[in-house]
Amino acid sequence: MFCEFAIIGTTASGKSALALQIAQEFSGVILSLDSLALYKQIDIASAKPSRKELASVKHFGVDEIYPNENFSVGMFFKIYERAKDYALNADCPLIITGGSGFYLRSMLSGLAPDVPKCDKALSNDEIYALAARIDPEFCAKFSPNDSYRLEKWYQIYKFSGAVPSTWLRENTSEPVIKELAIFEILWSAQAIRERIQRRTQAMFEAGLLEEAKFLFDTYGRELKPLRSIGLKECADFFDAKISREELASLICTHTAQLAKRQRTFNRSQFSKIFIGEPDAAREKIKGFLKNQAKRP
């Protein structure tokens, strides 16, 4: 029975493990939303599923390209279409999971055209004041402290000369997914910190430093995926800028900061069917799939 749904959550929340369990039990396939797992050879730093796990369940969005190859959201849409076609032909569930909420939001809301960056001649307060005058729709959705959104709004305004909210409606492509059940795994901040610490230690034991050295020796250090959390700190360690203890601490700190940003993004961008810890989410998803199986 084909259906599609998403399991989201912060980094180290256990969403990939839950997706794997559900896929094994219901003969499903997985589409990864992880922006680092896309890359071949970045296995430990991306917390990619093991080779055994990848062999047990068909995955899309994992090991798609090499670190020195370009990637875009449009390319991700094509991977989604491949995954959906496969699941339709196999008549099985498609489980979408990972931490890159931007990919998921783009599939649900459509993809806006790229807008060139411009010099930000105004402060955030000045941009927000301008938006309040000409684009109250934007101000109703976003905080005056949201620097990223304010900069994007200003870029669109300078590029188009139009009201950004109106311009986006007129120029954004149609969503590739019209409706999607979304389940979010949520832990307390303390629980996530502890999970991050355990995962970071496991990454070192699995050979994170050796993987980082191989990647830097092969590709240099300037490629975007090689400046991700877990790798950028290794570069500082190799340069003797930080100690081994500081290396682990910084990776944990930066990962926890990422988790906080992901939680904020998920809360503001998606309507969920369920929010809770993995065991409760598992039961909700099983109920959802059983209901899907009953549909004519």
UniProtKB/Swiss-Prot annotation:
Keywords: ATP-binding, Magnesium, Nucleotide-binding, Transferase, tRNA processing. It is an enzyme of class 2 (transferase). It holds the Pfam family IPPT. Residues 34-37 are annotated as: Interaction with substrate tRNA. Its EC number is 2.5.1.75. The keyword Magnesium applies. Gene3D superfamilies: 1.10.20.140, P-loop containing nucleotide triphosphate hydrolases. Its cofactor is Mg(2+). The record marks 100 as: Interaction with substrate tRNA. GO terms for molecular function: ATP binding; tRNA dimethylallyltransferase activity. It comes from the Bacteria. ATP binds at residues 9-16. Substrate binds at residues 11-16. Catalyzes the transfer of a dimethylallyl group onto the adenine at position 37 in tRNAs that read codons beginning with uridine, leading to the formation of N6-(dimethylallyl)adenosine (i(6)A). PANTHER family: TRNA DIMETHYLALLYLTRANSFERASE. Belongs to the IPP transferase family. Monomer. This is tRNA dimethylallyltransferase. The gene is miaA.
